[in-house]
């Protein structure tokens, strides 16, 4: 899984201010009714393939009332409706991210996040010292640094000499990887967590694979997935003030990138509480779909718990708990190698763990589908993808086609025989195509360890499309930037520091903009209200500084959002 670090400057949210209703100081503006507006002289991409382009749109309050040319849309509003000329700039539906851990991203924005700041050990030493002195990295008694590049996990001995002695001898330190799956704990933290050689001896071979060990057979601090979860349990719960601050930071980050709605796929109690706090302050105007995690251990009990959670949050405005999230596997990069593959890793002879029993998972899928719940599965290896599709196939067979947009996400590797199954089963592919780059994360720490037949089909987006599948736009923020233009560029070019990652898997630019609008709304089961510029839909709109459909890939990549409008309200605008 390619782990790009955050590209947008951290803490930039503090520079953004929620703008009042309307377009203040707009060019070519004629005064009129505050509740009716016409945006005209624009290059409009509607997100509707039946009517993809227009030049004007009329808005009344929070809804779109007409789309077309200026004479046409003017008939739908009163003569004194406000008119705003956009001088030929691009107007799009608000972008929708179908896999964004936005509240976690907001927490990173207000924490000690090393993303894009640390590349060398010396830089890390300086960053950790500053985070300790300033208190920015202190979580209870633990010093936590977020967003570490994965290359550091190949240098655990050096990490130990830097952060387990001296001023850190009695200071628990947790370095969390940018992938959200891995980390490193110093000796003080390992001791507190009870992670010792004796503890590891009691684990099964599979369980031990989540912990790194040195040549002396002692834990070396590296942890992944279940090991990381054991460490994370020692972190204190966030206060309401911190949850609200993280939520506000997330909103402004998303708005600055033109993201007006998103699916939060790991909605634990703190995440849901943060959204409720935002709603209680009348600040949650974006539509957010949130999926609690289940494990397919006891399907009936787990789904009953989800229904209780839905009941508890049913009155939170703009928050929709309409599905469930499961992990089928982990990540593929060395040394983690917890992604489930159809062929074993060359260095271990293991395939990586499938994190559910296929029969239990099928039982869960049948029951969830019958209850009207969307199934959203982290499936990265080709073995996990195959198993996840088979579970959803069981639901389709038992219940017929419910029409629910069940979704797999990540799909770094897919076996060719599974390409048509996405279309056949009506399963959406929420791909993070920002990761489809030729670089260390897709070559050096992946290719030497994988069977050539598995490695060949890496981020096979075009193959899924050509077989009739639907791709929705997804970032996995804060694992990587939520910047849509960067993701579209990567999907179109697949260029990286080490060349091009299989150009045959490129995705046409316009298809990617459909992915981040209409298709993502479909993945959230909200296409009736958002995702396209069409009469009756919410007025979620973004103004872009250039014609992103026709400029070169590099010019498109550097595009900026000028205005972001959510439900008719301007929530972000540049100073220009």
Language-model features: locations:
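Bacterial N-terminal signal peptides that target proteins for export
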Residues: 1-13
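Bacterial N-terminal signal peptides
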Residues: 10-22
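Bacterial Sec-dependent signal peptides at the C-terminal "C-region" and cleavage site
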Residues: 19-34
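Divalent metal-binding segments
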Residues: 30-40, 45, 49-305, 322, ...
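A generic structural signal for residues embedded in beta-strands
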Residues: 66-67, 145, 541-544, 573
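Acidic (Asp/Glu)-rich catalytic clusters
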Residues: 279-282, 309-315, 401, 422-424
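His/Asp/Glu-enriched, well-ordered alpha-helical/loop segment
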Residues: 366-376, 383-406, 410, 416, ...
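Ligand-binding beta-strand-loop-alpha-helix segment within the catalytic cores
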Residues: 428
């Amino acid at each position: 899984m390619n782990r790009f670090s955050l590209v947008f400057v951290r803490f930039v949210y503090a520079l953004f201010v929620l703008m009042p209703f309307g377009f203040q100081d707009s060019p070519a503006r004629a005064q009129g009714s505050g509740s009716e507006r016409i945006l005209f002289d624009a290059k409009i991409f509607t997100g509707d393939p039946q009517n993809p382009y227009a030049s004007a749109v009329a808005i009344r309050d929070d809804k779109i009332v007409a789309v077309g040319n200026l004479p046409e849309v003017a008939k739908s509003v009163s003569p004194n409706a406000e008119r705003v000329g956009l001088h030929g700039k691009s107007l799009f539906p608000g972008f929708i991210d179908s896999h964004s851990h936005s509240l976690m991203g907001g927490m990173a924005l207000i924490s000690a996040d090393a993303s894009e700041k640390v590349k060398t050990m010396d830089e890390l030493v300086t960053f950790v010292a500053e985070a300790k002195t300033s208190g920015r990295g202190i979580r209870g008694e633990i010093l936590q640094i977020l967003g570490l590049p994965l290359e550091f996990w190949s240098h655990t001995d050096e990490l130990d000499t830097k952060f387990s002695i001296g001023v850190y001898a009695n200071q628990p330190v947790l370095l969390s990887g940018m992938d959200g799956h891995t980390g490193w704990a110093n000796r003080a933290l390992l001791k507190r967590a009870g992670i010792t050689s004796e503890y590891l001896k009691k684990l099964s071979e599979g369980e031990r694979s989540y912990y790194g060990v040195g040549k002396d057979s002692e834990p070396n601090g590296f942890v992944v997935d279940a090991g990381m979860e054991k460490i994370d349990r020692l972190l204190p719960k966030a206060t309401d003030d911190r949850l609200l601050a993280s939520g506000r930071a997330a909103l402004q980050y998303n708005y600055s990138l033109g993201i007006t709605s998103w699916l939060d796929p790991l909605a634990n109690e703190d995440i849901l509480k943060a959204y409720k706090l935002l709603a209680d302050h009348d600040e949650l105007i974006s539509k957010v779909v949130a999926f609690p995690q289940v494990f397919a251990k006891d399907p009936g009990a787990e789904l009953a718990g989800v229904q209780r959670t839905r009941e508890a949050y049913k009155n939170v405005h703009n928050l929709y708990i309409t599905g469930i999230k499961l992990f089928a596997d982990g990540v593929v990069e060395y040394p983690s190698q917890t992604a489930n593959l159809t062929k074993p890793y060359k260095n271990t002879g293991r395939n990586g763990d499938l994190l559910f029993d296929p029969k239990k998972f099928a039982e869960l899928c049948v029951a969830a589908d019958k209850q009207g719940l969307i199934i959203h599965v982290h499936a990265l290896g080709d073995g996990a993808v195959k198993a996840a599709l088979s579970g959803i196939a069981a639901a389709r067979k038992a219940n017929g086609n419910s029409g629910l947009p069940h979704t797999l996400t990540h799909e770094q590797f897919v076996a060719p025989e599974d390409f048509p199954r996405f279309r056949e089963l009506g399963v959406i592919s929420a791909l993070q195509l920002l990761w489809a780059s030729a670089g260390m994360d897709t070559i050096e720490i992946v290719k030497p360890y994988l069977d050539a037949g598995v490695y060949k089909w890496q981020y096979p987006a075009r193959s899924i499309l050509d077989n009739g599948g639907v791709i929705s736009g997804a970032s996995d923020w804060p694992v990587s930037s939520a910047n849509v233009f960067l993701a579209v560029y990567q999907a179109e070019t697949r260029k990286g520091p080490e060349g091009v990652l299989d150009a045959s898997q490129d995705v046409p630019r316009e298809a990617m903009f459909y992915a981040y609008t209409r298709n993502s709304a479909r993945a959230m089961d909200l296409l009736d209200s958002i995702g396209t510029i069409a009469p009756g839909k919410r007025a979620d709109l973004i103004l872009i500084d250039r014609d992103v459909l026709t400029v070169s890939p590099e010019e498109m990549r550097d595009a900026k959002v000028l205005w972001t409008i959510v439900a008719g309200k301007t929530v972000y605008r540049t100073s220009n």
